[in-house]
Amino acid sequence: MTSSVSPVHSIHEYGNGIYKVVTFKGNRDPDNAYLRTSEATQSNDTKLDNNFSRARNMVLQYALCNSWDYFFTGTIDRAKFDRFILDAYQSRLSQFVRDKRKKYQSQIQYLLVPEQHKDGAWHIHGLISGLPEDAVSPFVPPAPQRLMDGGFLNWSDYMDTFGFCSLAPIRDAIATAYYITKYVSKDLSRRQADIGKHLYFHSRPLRKAVKASDVYLYNRPLDELCVNEYDFCKTGMVYGEDWIWPYDWAGAEPAEVIPLYPVVPDPDFQPMTIEPDFQQLKMEGYL
């Protein structure tokens, strides 16, 4: 078994005053550093769980570090495209977006997570920005009443090429960012052999979190910020407008208390405001 010395804590800046604190778990050596097990010794189940965790982390990063206009739900009409071949759909969708960038003269960006129906067909959920106002329009009859009443928009170019879609203007960026991570499921991760790398896909370039600091001595205030437990680490998302880096880490405890506030979704957030079929998906076990 091989091991390497790793930090006890790591802090990443997401922008807009948002930071992620990570406290790593493991066995301490006499010098208070952590020893972490090499990936080569991990079981397949552990690796799959790690893939799932990494994918969720990256989706949340992209969701929080970039500005988005709409929550997007896109389906695939069997008469227009093969709904069962995700690779072909992703390739065609990427080319479709490149074509629309030229048509609209706009830098369209997207972050999308595929979801599989029980019959094996695919559809997608995600975030999108850069669509000009004249590319989208309100739903009109005979569209379902919930789409018209809910203020959802149609992207006709997508609908003509692939099938039904809906766009919901984003009103709560934090809650929407956390909501989209729910579609990165462990079941999707375990089907990785069938879908390759496509736990999610996105346009380029997108901004990612930037490492602000590594801390190699245990720090109690940082540890207490980490409220999410995982197999190998604990994490916490916080607001800290005045949390300036590089910070004074001369000792194991900070010189002064810095006011930090947890980044959490609004408990009153209603998913049906961005996902018109939320209740149906929930009943079918997708959420």
What are these regions (language model features)?
Residues M1-G120, L131-L287:
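Right-hand nucleic-acid polymerase module
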Residues I124-L127:
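Short beta-strand->loop micro-motif that forms the acidic, two-metal-ion catalytic signature
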